[in-house]
Amino acid sequence: MRSEKEVYDIVLNFAKTDKRIRMVTLEGSRTNTNIPPDDFQDFDITFFVTDMDSFTSDDKWLDIFGERLILQKPEDMELFPAVEKGFSYLMLFTDDVKIDLTLLPLELIDEYFTWDKLVKLLLDKDNRIVKPPIPTDIDYHLQKPTQRMFDDCCNEFWNTTTYVVKGLCRKEILFAIDHMNDIVRKELLRMISWLIGIKQGFHFSLGKNYKFMKQYVPEELWERLMSTYNMDSYPHMWESFEQCMALFREVSSEVACQLDYQYPLYDEKISNYVIRQKKKYGIEDDNK
């Protein structure tokens, strides 16, 4: 595997010798001093260029970065069209180095620096940036919820539990799992993150997908949270679902108490609805 210096040398030497490339930046976790470095970190590189078409019309210039295992061009896909501006190349190389390279036109420079604060300037041929930004992850720090935000999280969680119940009672486990993972679990994790912020402060980030959450919660809570990922049968799905509801109730009640917010009354009503439906339809170990 090439070293970090070797990768930067290849990228910057190429950029310095190509007149179309006027500026180079680095984004993402490699700019964040709060993220422990490891071999899986991508090199998120952006080239600001004078002529986009001359690059995108032929991929041969990418060979300078090494032999690739796979290449993805999100902006060139029909099934998964990209929503971001520019044109990007997601490259995994045979030595396990991963480079996500994006091309942007020069006219987007000012707008670009408003998108994210985790940016480091690597090359500026024309001295366009008077004061290079200092990378910071402040935009990803935990956010103290307002009463309205707290209410919205509770409402989204408890409203969506009715969809999970519907899927389980209809024996549509994929429907139930989808709503459990995409919405119910998402709001549970959000609520847990708020409790962490209340106890630890709102001055740091839990990382993408809450990947550092384990460091900040009691072992008992963590084990209960992990148990909710067992969804391979209807009985297990019911157990995971009920554990999610119990965890959310406990955590959100504590958040409400700590922030002096009103806890929603519909928790009890929806919980009784879930009990009633489960009793009516029962459970069985059937994955069909």
Curated annotation (Swiss-Prot):
The keyword Nucleotidyltransferase appears for this protein: yes
Gene Ontology process terms (BP): response to antibiotic
TM segment ranges: none
InterPro entries recorded: Aminoglycoside_adenylylTfrase, NT_sf
Flavoprotein in keyword set: no
Broad class of enzyme this protein falls into: transferase
GO function terms (MF aspect): nucleotidyltransferase activity
Catalytic function, reaction form: streptomycin + ATP = 6-O-adenylylstreptomycin + diphosphate
EC number: 2.7.7.-
Changes seen on gene knockout: Loss of streptomycin resistance.
Keywords, in A-Z order: Antibiotic resistance, Nucleotidyltransferase, Plasmid, Transferase
NCBIfam families on file: ANT_6
Function: Mediates bacterial resistance to streptomycin, is probably a streptomycin 6-adenylyltransferase.
Additional remarks: In strain C179b a 10242 bp segment of DNA has been inserted into the chromosome between cj0168c and sodB. This piece of DNA forms a multidrug resistance genomic island and is transferable among C.jejuni strains.
Protein name: Aminoglycoside 6-adenylyltransferase
Native species: Campylobacter jejuni
Gene: aadK
